[in-house]
Amino acid sequence: MTRDIEQFRAHVRQWCAEHVPPDWRAAQTGVSDDEYVRFQKSWFAELHTSGFAVPHWPAEWGGGMSVAEQIVLYSELAAHDAPRLVLAFVGIHHAASTLLAAGTEEQRRRHLPAILDGEIWVQGFSEPEAGSDLAALRTTARRDGADFVVNGQKVWASGGLHADWCLLLARTDPDAKKRHGISYLLMDMNSPGIEVRPIKQATGESHFCEVFLNDVRVPAANLVGPENKGWQVAQETLGAERGMTMLELAERLGNAGFRWLVAECARAGVLAESLVADRLAQFEIEITGLRGLCRDLVEGRSDGPADASVVKLFYSELLQRLTDFGAQISGLAGHTVLAKPISSGWESGAWVLDFIGSWEWTIPGGASEIQRTIIGERGLGLPREPAGA
């Protein structure tokens, strides 16, 4: 590792010591939606002012960090228990990667600066009958002059209650094969005809929403990529969930998540018990392995056709086991915690709520069963599952 990287690490550590709110977890427990949005936007602005909000973007748009610098940044933010950018996530990762890869210059100039100013995005992909089989989506976009007229329903839209814009997949050619008649649109969430309904989760939160679209007019200028080629464009969006974003999550799990678990075992007075010590050691080994897989992926040492699926499966299953163990250790007391810091992700130390929430990670972005199929077919060369299996 070079001296420059070590200097950068020292700079990030100093910044974290000065800027990460020391009491943010307590302050973010049980807050209202408005308070949550204000805090998320304020923290994003703090990171942006210091050049830490979008390190993966090109330099001309406010990023330009090397892979090594990004690894250091995410590692130090996790080590200092910084809040997660939950509401900004889709914008800075999914929307940005799509616009940079397939958007027009006008679309980039309109939306990338707005994202840096706090514009919130939601992903409008999944539908009630099109989750794992996303290409089966039924939402339609009919061309009408200079607009597309959109009708349909989206579900599991993360952050939809607060979103300004939506990355929308809709069927523009009903006669084409499933993946060949889909277009990719940028939809203003303030457009007439949009209804957003929160989905109440078992944790008590409403992070996900249903979005109903009734004759919503989307300007044709908001089409990303060629008409009917949205499936190919969407691969850029889905690809943004891998690599560096998974490294950030792995670092957070290895810092805040594991630290909270050790502290829980200490509070329960079981830290010295051999069974508990063995489980903690196993978790630490797995977290170390996950970090290594993520770093191999982002540094280009791993480029197999199923490597991203391996990382996603490994992380989500490990998160679920770790939070399950935390819930067991916390006992009855863990079931009485009814609120958690909502800017923390799924490693808050509210173990029962974290465990319930962890199940979401084994479904979105490709369920664990889908990831295993990809690993088997693309990674190991096993026979493909028969159609309809």
Model regions and ranges:
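A short, Trp-centered hydrophobic/proline-enriched beta-strand micro-motif
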Residues: 117-125, 169
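Internal helix-loop-helix
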Residues: 41-118, 159-165, 287, 294, ...
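A short core secondary-structure module
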Residues: 147, 151-197
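Glycine-rich beta->alpha junctions and the first turn(s) of the following alpha-helix
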Residues: 3, 194-291, 361
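A structural signal for short hydrophobic beta-strand segments in well-ordered beta-sheet cores
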Residues: 139-142
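Amphipathic, small/basic residue-rich leader segments at the start of a protein or domain
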Residues: 1-89, 110, 114, 259, ...
